Amino acid sequence: MADQSIISALVLGLIEGLTEFIPVSSTAHVLLAGHFLGFKSPGNTFAVLIQLGAILAILLVYFQKLLSIALALPTSVKARRFVFSVLIAFLPAALIGAAAHGFIKAVLFETPMLICVVLIVGGVILYAIDRLPLQPRYTDVFDYPPSLALKIGLFQCLAMIPGTSRSGATIAGALLMGTDKRSAAEFSFFLAMPTMLGAFTLDLYKNRDALSFDDIGVIAIGFIAAFVAGIVVVRSLLDFVSHRGFTPFAIWRIVVGTAGLVGLWLVG
């Protein structure tokens, strides 16, 4: 393994794990790191499997809660309604994502300027929503009605534009629909599970002919980095947003997006 490949794998894996579950857009950070810092993905297999690292991180952290929900399904109406709400929230992105996958990957992912602009605009919107004197009507994800979940799922579709952030879109939508900050972030976690698994499966299928494990060491480094970083973020995010809200993430988006535009203007 070349030193540059090891460093790239480590950096990209950390970026994926650290940014996947917070409202700053992991896609934007990975693409901008590649554009400006030269941290190119070692290949299609690597790009697909670091996503799996982040997915396994959230499944591990939420394993006990998921098991409790599964065991309660036969007897609990509340558990069944919650699972239905998550699935109905997942449906819009599943349908649109499957239909528009090629266009999104081929066109939108190749426009760094668009990504930077979306980062800034999304940051401004998130900052504004975080500052609104909203009165939450829902403080527990298990009390979210399916109609609310569907609306949050429609917001998630905005994340197909690189730079938007899947968690950012769902959290912003949830807050506007009357949830509190902590439960908005937690519902985003639950919605991430089928959404990320679906996106991973689709990417795996689309890249099936290009998959190769020749650089298994590099792939393992990126996978482990994404997995460990993802665990750290998932375990700490709910308490963080309960006390500090989403303003720090909004500011970060604006700073990164602005720096990206300046970089594109200076060096292209």
Curated annotation (Swiss-Prot):
Miscellaneous note of the record: Bacitracin is thought to be involved in the inhibition of peptidoglycan synthesis by sequestering undecaprenyl diphosphate, thereby reducing the pool of lipid carrier available.
Q: What is its EC number?
A: 3.6.1.27
Q: Which GO terms describe its cellular component?
A: plasma membrane
Q: Name one Pfam family in it.
A: BacA
Q: What is its main location?
A: membrane
Topology within the bilayer: Multi-pass membrane protein
User: Per UniProt, which keywords does this protein have?
Assistant: Antibiotic resistance, Cell inner membrane, Cell membrane, Cell shape, Cell wall biogenesis/degradation, Hydrolase, Membrane, Peptidoglycan synthesis, Transmembrane, Transmembrane helix
Its GO biological process terms?
cell wall organization; peptidoglycan biosynthetic process; regulation of cell shape; response to antibiotic
List the subcellular locations.
Cell inner membrane
What InterPro entries does the entry give? UppP
Name of the protein in question: Undecaprenyl-diphosphatase
Entry function = Catalyzes the dephosphorylation of undecaprenyl diphosphate (UPP). Confers resistance to bacitracin.
Q: What class of enzyme is it?
A: hydrolase
Q: Which family does it belong to?
A: Belongs to the UppP family.
For this protein, the record's HAMAP family field holds: Undec_diphosphatase
- Recite the lineage of the species: Bacteria, Pseudomonadati, Pseudomonadota, Alphaproteobacteria, Hyphomicrobiales
The portions of this protein that span the membrane are 5-25, 43-63, 84-104, 106-126, 184-204, 213-233, 248-268
Answer whether the UniProt record assigns the keyword Transmembrane to this protein.
yes
Q: Which gene encodes it?
A: uppP
**GO molecular function, one example?**
undecaprenyl-diphosphatase activity
Catalysed reaction, written as an equation: di-trans,octa-cis-undecaprenyl diphosphate + H2O = di-trans,octa-cis-undecaprenyl phosphate + phosphate + H(+)
